[in-house]
C-alpha cells in the first residue's frame, strides 16, 4: 500500500511566478508532485486549456460547488472566484502523490486553518517593482487590475509568517532549488538525496566549536546565575547551550537563505560563517528562551 501524499501549498501574491516555479518542479519525478487543477469563474487566457490549467466554470456552477462542500478552499480575487476541488485532491493523495495547491493567499489561509497533512510555502517577489513588472509582462491586465493586484499584494505579504517556509523567487532556478530541498528535508520525495540542511548543520557545528566556546560557557553561567527557583535551577542545569546555539544558527541560516539568498551558497563555509557573525549579535545570552525567529532584518 502506498503512503499517502501530502498537500503542498505554494502561495503568494498574484504575479510572483507560482506557475513558472511549479511547472519546473513538476518535471522532477522524484518529488511525486501532482498539480491540483483549480476551478475558476474567470475567462481563459490565451493558451490555457480547460481541465489542464483550470476548470473554467460559470458563477452559478461555482456557487453550487460551495453549497455542496466540493471545494477545499475558495476565494474571490479581482472580480473572479477561485477554488480547489476536494475530490480531485483526495484521489491524488490516496495514490501517494504530493498535490500542489497553487492558490491565492486567502485560499491558503482556509486550508491552513481547516486541513491536516499540509506543507505551506510562501513565494515572495524580490521587490514590489519586480512584481509590477511581471504582472505587466503578461499583457493581459488593465491598469486598474494591475493596481488592484499590487494593492492586494501589500496586504498579503505580511501574512508570510503564517507559512512553514518563505521562499524568494528572484529566479525560477533558485526558487526551484530551494523548494526541492524543502521537500527532501520534509521527506516528501522518493529521492535518495539528503537535504542541504544536514550538511549545513555540520558546518555550523564546526564554526561554533572553533569560535564560540567562550560565548557558550558564559551563556550557561549566566543562565545558572539568574535561576532563582527550583524549577529554573533544574532547567539551567540541564541547559545545553552548545546544542541550542547550533540549532538556532542552523535554522536561521537556512531560513534566511530561503527567503533572501542564493541557495547554491548554503553549504559554503565562508557564506555560513558570515551569516552566523550577524546572527550572533541577536542571541540573548542571559536567557534560555530566544525569539522564535529573527525576522524584521
UniProtKB/Swiss-Prot annotation:
Against InterPro entries, the record matches this protein to: GK/Ca_channel_bsu, Guanylate_kin-like_dom, Guanylate_kinase, Guanylate_kinase_CS, P-loop_NTPase
Q: Which superkingdom heads the taxonomic lineage of this protein's source?
A: Bacteria
Species for this entry: Mesoplasma florum (strain ATCC 33453 / NBRC 100688 / NCTC 11704 / L1) (Acholeplasma florum)
**Which cellular component appears as one GO term in the record?**
cytosol
UniProt similarity note: Belongs to the guanylate kinase family.
Its main localization is cytoplasm
Q: In this record, what's one Pfam family?
A: Guanylate_kin
Q: Which SUPFAM superfamilies match?
A: P-loop containing nucleoside triphosphate hydrolases (SSF52540)
Its name, as the record gives it, is Guanylate kinase
Q: Name one GO molecular function term.
A: guanylate kinase activity
Enumerate the PROSITE patterns for this protein: GUANYLATE_KINASE_1, GUANYLATE_KINASE_2
Q: Where is this region: Unknown?
A: 205-297
Q: Which UniProt keywords apply?
A: ATP-binding, Cytoplasm, Kinase, Nucleotide-binding, Transferase
Amino acid at each position: 500500500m502506498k503512503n499517502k501524499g501530502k498537500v503542498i501549498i505554494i502561495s503568494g501574491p498574484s504575479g510572483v511566478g507560482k506557475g513558472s516555479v511549479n511547472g519546473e518542479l513538476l518535471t522532477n519525478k522524484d518529488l511525486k508532485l501532482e498539480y491540483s487543477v483549480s476551478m475558476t469563474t474567470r475567462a481563459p487566457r490565451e493558451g490555457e486549456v480547460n481541465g489542464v490549467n483550470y476548470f473554467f466554470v460559470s458563477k452559478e456552477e461555482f456557487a453550487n460547488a460551495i453549497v455542496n462542500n466540493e471545494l477545499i478552499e475558495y476565494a474571490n480575487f479581482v472580480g473572479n472566484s477561485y477554488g480547489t476541488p476536494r475530490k480531485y485532491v483526495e484521489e491524488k493523495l490516496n495514490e501517494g502523490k504530493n498535490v500542489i495547491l497553487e492558490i491565492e493567499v486567502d485560499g491558503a489561509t482556509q486550508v491552513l486553518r481547516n486541513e491536516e497533512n499540509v506543507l505551506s510555502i510562501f513565494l515572495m517577489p524580490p521587490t514590489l517593482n519586480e512584481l509590477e513588472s511581471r504582472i505587466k509582462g503578461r499583457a493581459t491586465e488593465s491598469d486598474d487590475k494591475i493596481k488592484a493586484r499590487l494593492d492586494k499584494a501589500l496586504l498579503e505579504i505580511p501574512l508570510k509568517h503564517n507559512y512553514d517556509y518563505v521562499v524568494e523567487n528572484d529566479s525560477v532556478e533558485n526558487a526551484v532549488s530551494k523548494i526541492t530541498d524543502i521537500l527532501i528535508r520534509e521527506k516528501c520525495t522518493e529521492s535518495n538525496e539528503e537535504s542541504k540542511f544536514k550538511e549545513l548543520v555540520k558546518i555550523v557545528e564546526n564554526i561554533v566549536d572553533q569560535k564560540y566556546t567562550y560565548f557558550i560557557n558564559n551563556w550557561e553561567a549566566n543562565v545558572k546565575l539568574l535561576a532563582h527557583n527550583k524549577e529554573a535551577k533544574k532547567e539551567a542545569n540541564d541547559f545545553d547551550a552548545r546544542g541550542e546555539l547550533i540549532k538556532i544558527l542552523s535554522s536561521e541560516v537556512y531560513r534566511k537563505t530561503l527567503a533572501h539568498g542564493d541557495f547554491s551558497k548554503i553549504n559554503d563555509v565562508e557564506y555560513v560563517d558570515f551569516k552566523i557573525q550577524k546572527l550572533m549579535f541577536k542571541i540573548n545570552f542571559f536567557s534560555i528562551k530566544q525569539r522564535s525567529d529573527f525576522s524584521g532584518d
